[in-house]
Amino acid sequence: MSTLDQTVHFDFRDNNPKNVHETLETVYKALEEKGYNPINQIVGYLISGDPAYIPRYNDARNLIRKHERDEIIEELVRNYLGKEQA
């Protein structure tokens, strides 16, 4: 059987929520260092999808764009509620 005929298993958990956490920490620090209100800027980005809310400083914009917004929101809600990923 060729590899093209085999079903590949995708596990969302392979995206490692720790990476989302680390990304948010880095973005938060970059926003703080630039003098912005980090919470307002991150919320603005998550609601609008506009990367202009996140500075390029310390590669913060590129880092946050590596994650889907719904993935970031999922991690935030899970963390807020103290729930582990199933």
UniProtKB/Swiss-Prot annotation:
Q: What is this protein called?
A: UPF0297 protein LSEI_0786
Pfam families named among the record's database cross-references: IreB (PF06135)
Record lineage: Bacteria, Bacillati, Bacillota, Bacilli, Lactobacillales
Q: Which family does it belong to?
A: Belongs to the UPF0297 family.
Instruction: Provide the species name.
Output: Lacticaseibacillus paracasei (strain ATCC 334 / BCRC 17002 / CCUG 31169 / CIP 107868 / KCTC 3260 / NRRL B-441) (Lactobacillus paracasei)
